[in-house]
A protein has these predicted regions:
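Predominantly soluble domains enriched in secretory-pathway, periplasmic, or organellar proteins
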Residues: 4, 11-385
Length: 385
């Protein structure tokens, strides 16, 4: 009888542990292999690969699980089923995409291009291009770099902001009319738009400028520039801002300089930089832990994750993640906050970090030069950017 009780207890413990481990997958585009790896993060192995176009970069998933892959080496999007892990189709585009973004209601996909000043809007029900809008004057000579970067949707889905990096402007496009509602002149090319927590301002994170690099604050109602905040850099440090994030209370905005190693901290009330920190080389993406206490900063020219204590505004640790010095754009904290996933793109590994210990616990081989990944958590597709 005693053996039976023990056996029953072991069975119950096994069953509980099985229930406590929901399905968790990473969907990883490989720019070097022209495919997508489907990774079971619980088993820590690749289940299958899916073919894509050339140089697949990012993925945008609808809530139902339809995924759009932007291929940066061919004029097409690859559409996948994120539940069955199958390729559905390809969507032919008028140019080569740089980035994509879904509308808040998931009904429309905005496509910004690297080799054309155009913005396409795609109906996600039919996968047909509804309209393609010219957003600026095309360059007369060969243009170095991507002409556009990340598109940004307003909360109500009525407008899309698109960066015109040829003419250093942001274009506001009305979705219903397909017309340009506003043109905002910037001191340099824009990389990303972050809405303030109260929605009143847009923080335009700019790249290289004559004066260095800056964050331009834009009134989200009038589309007028409120202030251009210059970022203090070390002597000789190139300016090339990339991404940022707000603290949970909205009092500070941390922004990363990919051109060097500076992470600048802006007081959002004063609209001024109050402190700078030194991260790894190519500081790119700050990801906040679930409890709001730390930023884990991904670098694009280094082999460490920089951990910043938000309250103290200090770097508390550098976590080595391999030998390669190129990391993918994005990371993911598990819902319980215990683990953080990122990719070392030169080592071709997905890295799992224990958040409390701030140490690497495992590495999962993935495809070559993966620069982005998406997550399937149960039936959900949470953001990794």
């Amino acid at each position: 009888m005693k053996k039976q009780v023990i056996a029953l207890m072991l069975f119950v413990l096994y069953a509980v542990s099985a229930v406590a481990a929901p399905d968790r997958f990473a969907i990883v585009p490989s720019e070097g292999d022209n495919n997508i790896s489907i990774v079971d993060l619980n088993a820590e192995k690749v289940l299958k690969t899916l073919p894509t176009g050339k140089t697949p970069h990012a993925i945008a998933f609808t809530r139902e699980g339809k995924g759009y892959v932007n291929n940066r080496g061919s004029k097409e999007l690859t559409v996948i089923d994120g539940n069955k892990f199958e390729v559905l189709k390809s969507i032919v585009l008028p140019a080569t995409s740089f980035q994509i973004a879904l509308s808040p209601d998931n009904k429309t996909l905005a496509v910004a291009y690297k080799d054309a000043l155009k913005l396409s809007l795609i109906d996600t029900a039919t996968d047909a291009i509804k309209i393609t809008i010219a957003v600026g004057k095309e360059p007369e000579a060969a243009f170095k770099g991507a002409m556009m970067k990340h598109p940004y949707w307003t909360k109500d889905g009525a407008y899309v902001y698109a960066s015109d990096n040829v003419n250093n402007t942001i274009i506001k496009v009305g979705v219903k009319t397909g017309s340009i509602a506003a043109t905002i002149n910037l001191p340099g090319p824009n990389h990303y738009l972050h809405p303030s927590p109260d929605g009143k301002l847009l923080y335009a994170v700019n790249e290289a400028e004559k004066a260095g690099t800056s964050v331009t604050l834009i009134d989200s109602v009038t589309d007028r520039i409120v202030k251009d905040v210059q970022i203090p850099l070390e002597a000789g440090e190139p300016g090339l801002l990339h991404h940022g994030d707000f603290t949970k209370d909205g009092k500070y905005f941390f922004v990363c300089n990919e051109g060097g190693r500076t992470v600048a901290i802006m007081d959002t009330a004063k609209q001024d930089i109050v402190k700078t920190l030194k991260a790894g080389m190519g500081a790119g993406h700050p990801g906040m832990t679930r409890d709001g206490n730390y930023f884990f900063v991904i670098q694009h020219k280094d082999n460490v994750i920089t951990v910043i204590d938000i309250a103290k505004q200090e770097v508390v640790k550098s976590i080595p993640v391999g030998t390669g010095k190129k990391q993918a754009h994005g990371g993911y904290f598990t819902p319980d906050g215990k683990f953080y996933y990122m990719i070392n793109a030169e080592d071709n590994n997905m890295v799992k970090i224990d958040v409390s210990k701030m140490d690497v616990v495992s590495k999962i081989p993935v495809g070559k030069s993966a620069m982005f990944f998406s997550i399937k958590e149960g039936n959900d597709f949470p953001s990794t950017e």
